[in-house]
Amino acid sequence: MHLLQCLLSTISLASTVTAFVPYSFNLEVSTEGPPSNDVARRFVPWKLLLDDSYNNHGSSSNGVSLTLDLKKFPVRRDNKYKVVLADEPTTPNTAALNQEGLDYSYFATVRVGSQGQQMWLVLDTGGPNTWVFGSDCTTVACQRHETFGEAASKSLKLLPLNWAVGYGTGLVSGVLGTDSLSLAGLDVNMTFGLAKNASTDFESYPVDGILGLGRSANSNFNTPSFMETVATQRLLKSNIIGFSFSRNSDGARDGAANFGDLDTTRFTGDIVYTNTTGDSNNWRIPLDDASVNGTPCRFVNKTAVIDTGTSYAMLPPKDATVLHNLIPGAVTTSHGQNFTLPCNSTAVVQVSFSGLSYNISPKDYVGPAYGSACLSTIVGQALYGDDVWLLGDVFLKNVYSVFDYDNHRIGFANRSVPIASPTTTVAAAANPSATDGAGSTLTGSMAVHTGSASIVSRFVHWPFIFALLCMVLV
């Protein structure tokens, strides 16, 4: 975004594609659009298009609702969310990566402001911008989350600038402010957004905001990003982040993000790096190829955006079709947009970078049951054009990934085999103390995040797909 636009009354939060929405909507999304360098961050939820029998009103010709009952999860009751808390790490500068129990989203506890208010933020390499729900927000989505404002921090300085982020059915918008953020032993003073309005997209989702860890040094506020501030203050010996994502079915609560150094206990073999390519907005690297059961797909001139804020893998429809054609029993629906496959698939799916291949486990690419088959979590969506993939947590759960800000590269190694942790159901106290960490007060695998409002319990349909970005800059 140009400097002049940053001085306008509304600032768009992000400029890279990412995916992150708890609901699915009946939206028309183009899968064949050309790539654009001038897009603002937008989370666009969409519905699965299973076959041509579905009409534009969200139902089939037989009157069956398009909304898929993939899995019902009681995410909120009396302003509480059930989540799986990761074990508190013992290594320095490391944050526990919690999740909601479906491998759908991962988030860390960040302390905000002079009183160190605990908030759950997605650590998102898809963009450099950071925002939290503000205390001035009165929408239901905000009331169901922890909020932050002047009453919670004597050091908060509000700025006369606004921002807005577009969603499929609404907006999240607010003001900018400057205050301290503390994560993994790193204390950073920076500018971030405080949401004053939020659409229904976040009503049933656990997170209180997003911490942008994109490759760009500056956010779209034209202010330094979190990692740029860390680098300027020389808080780490190396400006790198290593991610290890938990898989809930493994029974281990070992998700973590470590800053400044490699955690050699979390991977086997060597880290092999690939230099980034393209503009500085994305963590994008050249993709060698993909294969199924050893048969190469023979993709050429492809690149992949590696995004911790995206749940699934999104490939251009033609590429997704080629890959699924090699999986025994896979069936293409929706013109290469969505796929079904055998629920007991054992096909070995691999992607290759810098001459090495990495598995995507059937535990990750086989999604929820649909009829006699299961849905594939590898989706046909051309978010950046016909030659760019978006690889999210479906892939990242299989590797230890390193984002190297100093040398502009991404490294992978195979994850260590996780060891299952004992599980205990516990509840978090309302308004958790600023002096008690999540690991010290919430020691079990199931915990409850508590806010200030009382909301009636309800079940929600969790979506099958994370979402995308498409709002064009004015």
From Swiss-Prot:
Alphabetical list of Gene3D superfamilies matching this protein: Acid Proteases
Induction of synthesis: Repressed under nutrient-rich culture conditions.
Secretion signal, residue range per the UniProt entry: 1-19
Gene designation: ctsD
One GO biological process term: proteolysis
Description of pH dependence: Optimum pH is 5.0.
Keyword Cell cycle: no
Residues excised as propeptide: 453-474
SUPFAM superfamilies the UniProt entry points to: Acid proteases (SSF50630)
Matching InterPro entries: Aspartic_peptidase_A1 (IPR001461), Pepsin-like_dom (IPR034164), PEPTIDASE_A1 (IPR033121), Peptidase_aspartic_dom_sf (IPR021109)
MF terms (GO), sorted A to Z: aspartic-type endopeptidase activity
Protein name: Aspartic-type endopeptidase ctsD
Presence of the UniProt keyword Membrane in the record: yes
Domain Peptidase A1: 106-413
Subcellular location: Cell membrane
Glycosylation sites: 189, 197, 275, 301, 338, 344, 414
Protein family: Belongs to the peptidase A1 family.
EC number(s) recorded for this UniProt protein: 3.4.23.-
Mode of membrane association: Lipid-anchor; GPI-anchor
Broad class of the protein's primary localization: membrane
UniProtKB keywords: Aspartyl protease, Cell membrane, Glycoprotein, GPI-anchor, Hydrolase, Lipoprotein, Membrane, Protease, Signal, Virulence
Active site, renumbered: 124, 307
Cellular component GO terms held in the UniProt record: plasma membrane; side of membrane
Lipid attachment points (GPI-anchor amidated serine): 452
Protein's job: Secreted aspartic-type endopeptidase which is secreted and contributes to virulence.
Species the sequence originates in: Aspergillus fumigatus (strain ATCC MYA-4609 / CBS 101355 / FGSC A1100 / Af293) (Neosartorya fumigata)
